Amino acid sequence: MDCIRILWSVAVGLLLVSWRPTMFAASPTCDTVQNILAPCAGFLTGQEPSKACCTGVNNLNNSRKTKADRVAVCNCIKELTKSIAYDPKRMPLLSTKCGVKPDFPAVDKNLDCSKLPV
């Protein structure tokens, strides 16, 4: 009987160790962020956001579960925006236009992503 309990405990322990819920998934990669935000390029230069843009913003927002996720996404956005002409004041408007909370920060070259609020 004790042997069965030990085996059962080991089996449950292995299941718990091997189970990786979403909250433990890695932060989104910059390639993922770029693909998600690609439909928003027009918005960042003055147009209205498309449905695809808002869907992407909502998906990206849902992937930013931890401060590390938010910092990673912010740094990716900073890197991506180096290569396009855009109005950094429009970035936070994505949240309003697409109905997303929390707000996206105004990302520019001077933003220290590590100091974003929790």
Swiss-Prot record:
CDD domains in UniProt: nsLTP1
Gene Ontology terms, MF aspect: lipid binding
Signal peptide bounds: 1-25
InterPro entries, per database record: Bifun_inhib/LTP/seed_sf (IPR036312), Bifunc_inhib/LTP/seed_store (IPR016140), Plant_nsLTP (IPR000528)
Gene3D superfamilies listed in its UniProt record: Plant lipid-transfer and hydrophobic proteins (1.10.110.10)
Entries under PANTHER family matching the protein: NON-SPECIFIC LIPID-TRANSFER PROTEIN 2-RELATED (PTHR33076)
Protein family per UniProt: Belongs to the plant LTP family.
Name used for this protein in its record: Non-specific lipid-transfer protein
The organism's taxonomic lineage, starting at the top: Eukaryota, Viridiplantae, Streptophyta, Embryophyta, Tracheophyta
